[in-house]
């Protein structure tokens, strides 16, 4: 075979290799795209939440003054202590504290959709309800709001931890039992994690005054590690 023909053959082979590689890459890309579409369709068909592949391990805390460092030095509340705990435990998680002093379950319910969309959390901690009781709001409203928030978080693909609260004895035994019970009722109905009493070891001890600020409503700096100690065992189960 003449040398000139060999050169042409090599050139033709080079063009063929480039063409076949390009077609193969296009085929693989199309296959990957079809696989993602199929997974999304299956998830929708079976009612499973579709979560972004880049979703980070984010813990969203939706609470009131108990989680917003009311009356405390910055960095001493239980939420900043949680961030330090995660770092010490080498847990790669980000904490977003969306707590607002004075907030009620109605306020939390009005904010939850935007918070879920913005932060795409893997875990949502709901610490609300105390201000509902202080304002004498209907228990049915509090329960409905907690249920709606829990369902929204679950629909977004997040795990949920409810932090239960109790009211002082002067509210009456029947009201106190019903109020404390609504947290477990919601948790059981929605199949989510529950911490029965967020302020255990803080508000139910003989020397209560030593654990609270002068207003006798908000835990002081000394109480914050105990509050974290209450939350951590339940939260740890959700982030492992």
Which residues are covered by each model-predicted region?
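Intrinsic low-complexity/disordered segments
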Residues: 9-12, 20-23, 41, 48, ...
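Acidic/histidine-rich helix-loop elements
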Residues: 71, 96-105, 133-137, 216
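Serine-esterase "nucleophile elbow" of acetyl-processing enzymes
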Residues: 51-101, 111-120
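Alpha-helical cap/lid subdomain in secreted, periplasmic
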Residues: 5-6, 12, 17, 81, ...
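Intrinsically disordered, low-complexity and often Lys/Arg-enriched segments
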Residues: 2-33
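Bacterial N-terminal signal peptides
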Residues: 31-47
